[in-house]
A protein has these predicted regions:
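Active-site-adjacent mobile loop/cap segments within catalytic or ligand-binding domains
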Residues: 280-338
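Solvent-exposed loop/turn segments at secondary-structure junctions
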Residues: 135-138, 183-187, 224-229, 251-254, ...
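Active-site-adjacent substrate-binding region
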Residues: 258-282
């Protein structure tokens, strides 16, 4: 091969190498540019999310300034400013016009959304006692002439209808349950007592039932919250439920046993119905009654089901969920007697 041809061939090889290097350089530049843009966008997005979280947290803190968590877990907390409502008796005694005439029938006809098969039974024994220290706590959707939480009281459309729903759901699961429907407000009025004596009067009923029936093991005082709907409603699988809140009084020596009972139920609810339970509220004697008849039994609790704005459908779903958990807990604790 002539020297000239060899020289031309070498030149072409050199030129091809140069073009290849240029292609590689351009490709590396494009990759670098894409990576830089991606990192910049990611950084910007993270900053935006952090700012949004700060705004949300700030808004939550402003909206709920009284909640002070006092344990390693957020489920148990104290609320130092949330005293028991102390409405005047004339407010509680006033019967407002109902939006629906057959309110008892509406609550009473709510059916379980699924077929319940009771694998166990207490065989006629009543082992759960449900009562209502604030028996006239009502729900604004069913009261015609008010939208104020402090006026949500009624002699018929009240929390006792929710207690009955819970009692029926417990019975369906084989756990014999007595639902106390005595109107505490009527007893207070007949004795000329203030609303603050509600727990003293309901205590008499609890002790009377306890003396008459030695089989009673669980004592559940059902209430509704006075907070508005955004604080008493949760959504599970796109379905709205009335939130649950356990209240434990710390004004007696053995309250930690009640706290453990509440914690057990809360944990079971979290496993099956996440976020249905808002947690456990500890209340001392400086914040209200402080005992709430819970010194009678370690299995005694206040359970708030929903609030002033919740509907019968939301309340019913929550009583079904609570009955499922409470009945399973009962059978687990009494497994030897099955």
């Amino acid at each position: 091969m002539s020297p000239k041809l060899t020289e031309d061939k070498n030149k072409r090889k050199g030129k091809n190498k140069t073009i290849l290097f240029l292609y590689i350089a351009v490709l590396l530049f494009i990759i670098w540019a894409i990576a830089t843009i991606w990192l910049a966008m990611t950084y910007k997005l993270n900053n935006k999310n952090n700012e949004e979280n700060e705004v949300i947290n700030s808004a939550f803190n402003k909206k709920n300034p009284t909640i002070n968590f006092n344990s390693e877990e957020d489920k148990i907390f104290e609320n130092t400013d949330r005293d028991d409502l102390k409405p005047p008796m004339e407010t509680v005694l006033k019967d407002r016009t109902l939006r629906l005439k057959n309110i008892k029938g509406i609550f009473g006809n709510m059916k379980s959304p699924k077929e319940i098969s009771a694998f166990h039974s207490t065989f006629g024994k009543e082992v759960v006692y449900i009562y209502h220290s604030h028996s006239r706590e009502s729900f604004l959707p069913y009261l015609k002439d008010t939208s104020r939480p402090e006026e949500a009281y009624h002699s018929v459309a009240n929390i006792t209808l929710v207690g009955k729903m819970l009692g029926r759901a417990m019975d369906q699961r084989g756990v014999g349950t007595k639902v106390e429907t005595v109107d505490i407000v009527h007893l207070l009025n007949s004795r000329k007592l203030a609303y603050t004596s509600s727990y003293n009067v309901s205590r008499e009923l609890v002790q009377l039932s306890q003396n008459e029936n030695k089989d009673l093991e669980y004592f559940i005082d059902i209430h509704r919250d006075s907070l508005r709907k955004e604080n008493t409603t949760t959504e599970i699988n796109r379905t709205k439920y009335a939130s649950l809140l356990f209240v434990v009084g710390t004004g007696h020596a053995e309250y930690e046993k009640n706290l453990q009972f509440a914690n057990n139920l809360h944990t079971l609810l979290e496993n099956r119905y996440p976020a249905l339970s808002k947690g456990i509220l500890k209340k001392s004697s400086s914040q209200g009654n402080g005992i709430y008849n819970q010194d009678i039994s370690p299995n005694s609790l206040i359970i708030e089901i929903g609030g002033v704005d919740n509907t019968v459908e939301e309340l019913h779903r929550s009583t079904e969920a609570l009955a499922e958990v409470l009945s399973d807990y009962y059978w687990e604790e009494n497994s030897e007697s099955r």
